[in-house]
Amino acid sequence: MSPLPGIKQFDLTGRAALITGGSKGLGLAMAAGLASAGADVVLTSRTESEVSTAAAEVAEQFGKRAIGLQADVSAPDDCRRVVEQASDAFGKIDILINNAGINTRGSIEELTYEEFQSVERINVDGVWLMAKAVVPKMKEAGYGRIINMASTLGVVGLSNRTPYATSKGAVVQMTRALALELAATGITCNAICPGPFLTPMNVPIADDEQTKKFIVGAVALERWGQMEEIQGAAILLASGASSYMTGSLLMVDGGWTAR
């Protein structure tokens, strides 16, 4: 048997990644993971000061090039601009992680149509717009990895989450459709479906008794996911180790969807 590449498949040295919503939470964790594997990274956020600070921290910690750019992924012009800026900075974009997203909670009677629309604009339109902007660059290179951040709520239901669950279900189907559309171009498209992670957004509710009861009842491992536990999935899908994966959903949910 000829030698197999093994762990070398996960090496991202020489790759350039663009991560939306990269200033904090899972986006920043994934950016750090990719940089630790050798990639140069561009992070985007709606808040310029936050994303600039995050990029500087990644660059200092891992010794890779890291740039922070302000962008609203629901704005087509912003999506085109950051793709051009990232491509100009690094000469290419090998990896796109569509991570930017928002959430809202409430019953269908409580929520307004405007609140519903705001979630869909960021979580669905933003994914499509970023993919639309980056695909021509990847096609020209004959290589690309598109990673969409979906959710367990894209495949299972949860009350009082209709806008978010609807948006993530759309991301699941967009991932599959794009995977088929791009299969012959050298571009793969996969999704990560996180379960409950202890992100900065969730820290305030982590000690709530009702939340604790839900985590124990729904998650097989009976705990929150930690930030570093998303990194392996991102590195896998961004690297050559996932070359035979496209249209796949990678469940990183502590066993929630195994029940």
Language-model features: locations:
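Short, small/polar-rich loop/turn modules that mediate ligand/substrate recognition or access, typified
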Residues: 183, 188, 245-247
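The beta1-alpha1 cofactor-binding region of Rossmann-like NAD(H)/NADP(H)-dependent oxidoreductases
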Residues: 48-49, 70-82, 113, 228-229
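Active-site helix of classical SDR
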Residues: 131, 167, 175
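Short C-terminal tail/terminal secondary-structure segment
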Residues: 2-8, 156, 235, 246-259
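Conserved glycine-rich cofactor-binding loop
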Residues: 16, 23-25
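Substrate-binding pocket helix/loop in short-chain dehydrogenase/reductase
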Residues: 79, 107-108, 112-117, 215
